[in-house]
C-alpha cells in the first residue's frame, strides 16, 4: 500500500477532492484522520514519568514505526490518502523519522480572500456556528480566522514548512 497525505487551506476543496478520489476503487481517502494524533500521543509518552523511569526509546520507536502500517492494515486499497496536518513542524519531524515510505503531501491552496469569503458565507448560512459564537461581524470573524493558532494560520504555517528547502 502506498500512503499519501492530503492537507491544505480550509475551504480549498479538500472535501470535494476526497469525494472524487474515493470514486476510484483503488483509492481510499480518509476524512480528517486521527493517525497523526496517534503519532503525537505515542511520541509524547517519552515525556511521561512512567517512560522516564525506564526510557526504552528503541522499543517505543518501533511502535511509532508501525503506526501507519498497522492502522491501515485492513484497508483494501492500493493507495491510501491520509487527510490531516502533515506539514506541521512536529508532524513532519515524526513522519521523517518513523514513516517508512517516501513522504508525498498533496496540499490544496486557494487565494486567502476567497478562503475568508467562503468561511463568512458558510457562517451566514449556518446557525450557531463557531465563528459567530466568538465574533460579532464579518470583519471580526476574518480577524479571528486569521489569528495565530487558528485553522487558516495553522495551514499557512504548514505550507511554509513544506516549502522550506531541506
Listing of model-derived features with the role each one plays in the protein:
Residues 66-68, 147-148:
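Electropositive, surface-exposed helix/loop patches at the edges of structured domains
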Residues 70-73, 97:
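A general structural signal for short secondary-structure junctions and capping/turn motifs
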Residues 79-166:
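PAPS-dependent sulfotransferase catalytic domain
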Amino acid at each position: 500500500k502506498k500512503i499519501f497525505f492530503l492537507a491544505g487551506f480550509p475551504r480549498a476543496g479538500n472535501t470535494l477532492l476526497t469525494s472524487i478520489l474515493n470514486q476510484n476503487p483503488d483509492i481510499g481517502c480518509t476524512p480528517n484522520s486521527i493517525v497523526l494524533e496517534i503519532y503525537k500521543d505515542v511520541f509524547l509518552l517519552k515525556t511521561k514519568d512512567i517512560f522516564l523511569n525506564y526510557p526504552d526509546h528503541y522499543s517505543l520507536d518501533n511502535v511509532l514505526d508501525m503506526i501507519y502500517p498497522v492502522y491501515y492494515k485492513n484497508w483494501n486499497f492500493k493507495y491510501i490518502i491520509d487527510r490531516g496536518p502533515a506539514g506541521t513542524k512536529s508532524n513532519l519531524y515524526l513522519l521523517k523519522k518513523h514513516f517508512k515510505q517516501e513522504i508525498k503531501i498533496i496540499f490544496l491552496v486557494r487565494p486567502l480572500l476567497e478562503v475568508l469569503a467562503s468561511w463568512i458565507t458558510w457562517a451566514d448560512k449556518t446557525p450557531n456556528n463557531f465563528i459567530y459564537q466568538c465574533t460579532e461581524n464579518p470583519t471580526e470573524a476574518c480577524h479571528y480566522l486569521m489569528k495565530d493558532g487558528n485553522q487558516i494560520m495553522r495551514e499557512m504555517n504548514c505550507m511554509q514548512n513544506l516549502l522550506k528547502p531541506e
